[in-house]
């Protein structure tokens, strides 16, 4: 008996920048704006943003209320697509992950990435919603931020939240970050 299993391929835009360096743009090509960027150099990998996930607060905790605008639609999530692409590329470990900002469509899947892959460093600014001018744009940002930070600490990942000049430049394989 032979059982064949095929996974759905992920079509990501990939740019080769020379010297074995690649940049993979993984997005939904939808209205949500959820995306992820995988950097690859000499067998080293880094992930910038992790996109929206399937997890959202149910409103039972007053710290994480159920709000209008929280993404609950499967077409707005990138979680499955991200993990399929990481597997297709052969990622076993991430040197770093970086959340560009704390909106759920950029860090929603961070806790799942931290659970599935060894990660050396996690760059994520401290949570602040002071520049958000309307309550509906708060979405489930704090919920996803707290999940990501908690998971990083549980996994022993170096969490860098105050990015100094020393932290802001480093190597990923042959790539200067």
What are these regions (language model features)?
Residues 7-177:
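Non-globular, low-confidence helical/coil segments that flank catalytic cores
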Residues 1-5:
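Bacterial N-terminal signal peptides
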């Amino acid at each position: 008996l032979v059982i064949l299993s095929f996974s759905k391929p992920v079509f990501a835009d990939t740019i080769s920048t020379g010297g074995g360096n690649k940049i993979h743009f993984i997005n939904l090509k939808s209205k949500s704006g959820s995306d992820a960027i995988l950097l690859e150099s000499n067998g080293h990998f880094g992930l910038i943003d992790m996109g929206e996930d399937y997890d959202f607060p149910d409103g039972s905790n007053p710290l994480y209320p159920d709000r209008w605008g929280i993404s609950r639609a499967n077409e707005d999530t990138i979680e499955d697509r991200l993990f399929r692409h990481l597997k297709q590329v052969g990622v076993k470990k991430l040197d770093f992950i970086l959340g560009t900002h704390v909106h759920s469509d950029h860090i929603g899947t961070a806790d799942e990435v931290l659970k599935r892959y060894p990660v050396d460093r996690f760059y994520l600014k401290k949570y602040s919603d002071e520049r958000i001018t309307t309550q509906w744009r708060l979405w489930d940002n704090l919920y996803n931020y707290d999940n990501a930070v908690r998971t990083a600490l549980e996994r022993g990942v170096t969490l860098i939240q105050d990015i100094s000049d020393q932290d802001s430049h480093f190597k990923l394989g042959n790539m200067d970050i």
